[in-house]
Amino acid sequence: MRTAIFADLHDNYTGLTTVLEDAADQKVDRFVFLGDAGHQPRILAALQVRKIPCVYGNWEVSGLRRFPEALAEWVGAWPAILHEDGIVYCHASPDMPAALPTTAVAADWMKPGMSWSALFPRLHQNTNAVWNALAWMETHDVTIAFHGHTHVQMVWVWELATNQLRSFASLERVRLAPGTRTIVGVGSAGVPEDGPWPRYAIYDDDARIVLMRCLRDD
């Protein structure tokens, strides 16, 4: 199965349609969205009508009460993570508090003055958070984690036998190797910070390959 994973639209409807069109050209079988859609109802409606599985990000938590009632009920039920066989999808890190399973619960829990970074760390700037994510993956027997939030594409590969952690930017393809745990930052479809073009990832679980898509105009 080929899964297109994208994140961080931040009200960029053109970014959404660009990713959807490219992914269709790449013959993906399904989509997963990793949070921070924005506050435009039409973006949320586009995700909803396509029945795209979504996890919540900080924008959903902070903006939940701005949405129309029907959308708020749907977004409020988004989970913190999607955990499949050997795979996890999350906004910032899979190491999320078990007490915050949905957007609505997280929105009720957050109070003024609380640190967003504690709940949504930026992995490319926080090595401890990377190791916490890898520890969660090891505990839950997860081989690969996909995340957004950082707005950059980046990959971490932890080799279990040597305890060596390597990070990579600007990769076009990642092949999952035995005896490793891999974290993939899919980049931003709406507001990328590693260039002006929308970015996302495609995971082919049969080939065990991740394609890092960068949608240049040319």
Locate predicted features.
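Acidic, His/Gly-rich catalytic cores of divalent-metal-dependent hydrolytic chemistry
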Residues: 4, 144, 156-218
